[in-house]
Amino acid sequence: MELKDYFPEMQVGPHPLGDKEWVSVKEGDQYVHFPKSCLSEKERLLLEVGLGQYEVLQPLGSPWQRYLLDHQGNPPQLFETSQFIYLNHQQVLPADLVELLQQMIAGLEVILPISTTQTAFLCRQATSIKVLRSLEGLLPTLESDFGLALTMFVGNAWYQVAAGTLRECFEEECQLLTAYLKQKSGGKLLTFAEVMLWSILSHQSFPALTRQFHQFLNPQSDMADVVHALWSEHGNLVQTAQRLYIHRNSLQYKLDKFAQQSGLHLKQLDDLAFAYLFLLKY
């Protein structure tokens, strides 16, 4: 008999899980995951001791996993810009799908299996709008090919943040996505601004994320007038520049610099709406 016969709830994937409710065991070039809730004390003890050719993964191997998921150690390095892309799925991701996503996501640093139904991808650069559109168009094909319902959430591009801040933002982005999916259906690509808009309108609180944006979006900031003018002019750059009495090139420079520092591209309607409502609320 095979392990699946003894443990029907087990799942197989290409990476160990960071979820403390599961035990990950290495078998060859893949990992077998056992839910602790379905294991007896004797079975858990056997897994902890080891089962012959099976290697129990303890602790997790990646420094990024230990730092972000277990609050242990330090990150191996920090990048000028860091961005997390989250994938919600019904079961552990197949190795073929993980390999395909690795090829598609530019600047991928590490894969973080958060649980059997959620995986994060840490990128050392911001993901371009072109790549996001490609991913969005490909999601239905991936769902069909692999028989999985997938929801992809593109986190914010964090610029020059400290290690502790990056971890706080990672944790709150996870919480934000979980809260959103409890009330909304998934099955598509979600942008950070889109989900943050929902959080403001539904009175959800994410202190670390709020602190980050309050640095750039507050009544005393230079960008407050730009955001209000852009909103009033429905995103028209020429009319916004005229309203602010500045050259269009100067306005474009401000927008580019703001996008680099905050991760928000104010020429995108959702980003502009989030920035505008954030200023009204905070």
Curated annotation (Swiss-Prot):
Pfam families: HTH_30
Entry-linked InterPro entries: CdaR-like_regulators (IPR051448), Homeodomain-like_sf (IPR009057), PucR_C-HTH_dom (IPR025736), PucR_C-HTH_sf (IPR042070)
Record-linked SUPFAM superfamilies: Homeodomain-like
Role summary: Not essential for viability or growth. Nevertheless, uncontrolled production in E.coli is detrimental to the normal physiology of the bacteria.
Protein name, entry field: Leucine-rich protein
Native organism taxonomy: Bacteria, Bacillati, Bacillota, Bacilli, Lactobacillales
